[in-house]
Amino acid sequence: MKTCHSHDELIHIYLDGDATKEQKEELYAHLQSCPSCREHLQELKKSIAFIQSSSHIEAPEGFTAGVMAKLPKTKKTAKWKLKAKRHPILVAAAIFLIMMSAAFFSAWSHTTDGIAVSGNGPFVIDKEAGVVVVPEGEVIDGDLVVRNGTLVLEGEVRGNVLLINSRFNKDTLYASPNQVTGEIEEVDKALSWAWYNMKEFFNEVVAVFDAGEDDPHSTDN
């Protein structure tokens, strides 16, 4: 996005909370007549809110120390420090993506420990056979999640079905989609698991932003 070069640094000072009263007034006046800077500032605000909303995601224990230990020792220069200082949001976003990816891959390793099911309704688990059965005539209200097993769906699921490292029983494979009111998604690889979690996370963030934009009391300075 093309912005006015003369006000680009002022925008970053404003977002860092270091702008003086005069600088704020100058920026507000400029935003009234410059749509590109106004849109750029709005995108930066959304990026900051996105990063702050992800504070609950943690990297695996020892991850940071391990990464730092493997980094090659290089001579520090003022050039990269200047770039990092001028683009703190890009640096923070890169660190966030690394930590989030590590957390998702770590979570995937725990999904292969044994058969597990979550859902609101009657179902039968045969751990020895690795089978989950929703009996005929029974209804699962809401989403059904099956990990490391085979799903035999004879009843109905009023929601989504997520199969993590799992599959449908071959006898019910073609009939089952007609018994699910929501979506059916299969995740059988670590990358698919990471993508699924990232997609769900981004959907939640977008929903928060949409709710904020629909709020008539929310205004930008």
From Swiss-Prot:
Entry note: cofactor: Binds 1 Zn(2+) ion per subunit.
Q: Which UniProt keywords apply?
A: Membrane, Metal-binding, Transmembrane, Transmembrane helix, Zinc
Q: Which residues bind Zn(2+)?
A: 30, 34, 37
State if Transmembrane helix is listed as a keyword. yes
Q: Which coenzyme or cofactor does it need? A: Zn(2+)
Q: Which family does it belong to?
A: Belongs to the zinc-associated anti-sigma factor (ZAS) superfamily. Anti-sigma-W factor family.
Q: What is this protein called?
A: Anti-sigma-W factor RsiW
From what organism does this protein derive? Shouchella clausii (strain KSM-K16)
**Which lineage do the record's taxonomy fields give for this organism?**
Bacteria, Bacillati, Bacillota, Bacilli, Bacillales
**Name of the encoding gene:** rsiW
